[in-house]
């Protein structure tokens, strides 16, 4: 059971509780303005008009999407497109958000904006965020719980403090801590 539902028995309702952003796959239609993609997603998820407009206005403000809404996805920079992808994944107000490498390839300003937005989304809307990343700064900024996986094995399941307690030396970075864990497990 997830969120009180059996996923394979209540697939349609279950999917409405999930938002997904994959770095290499887009839910935005490449040659149409972002707003057109959003309106199609509104119809797919059967979002009531008032809720859609309210959510779109909120996301547009928080992610600074104003001038981007009338631009085709193919004309956006990577950072702009990622912000639009994140908004697309949240239009239907999911309870769970899967983010795969949400800051990969982004400049420093865009990374900070995306991280700040994810934190706010989690805090204000109680959205559960499942994040996969190789960016240790993402982990440090966003993670309450860390699962470290290597070659299909669970190496660590704990808090960020638990991860940091494995420091090979006092001033070790998260990259160095994880590299040491991988060495310890011969990964």
Where do the model's predicted regions map?
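Conserved ABC ATPase "signature" region
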Residues: 39, 43, 50-68
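Catalytic Walker B motif of ABC-type/P-loop ATPase nucleotide-binding domains
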Residues: 97-100
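Helical segment within the ABC ATPase nucleotide-binding domain
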Residues: 112-124
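Conserved ABC ATPase signature
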Residues: 72-76
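A short, proline-enriched helix->beta-strand linker immediately N-terminal to the Walker B motif
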Residues: 91-95
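ABC ATPase "signature
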Residues: 157-158
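A short, surface-exposed alpha-helical micro-motif characterized by mixed small hydrophobic
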Residues: 139-141
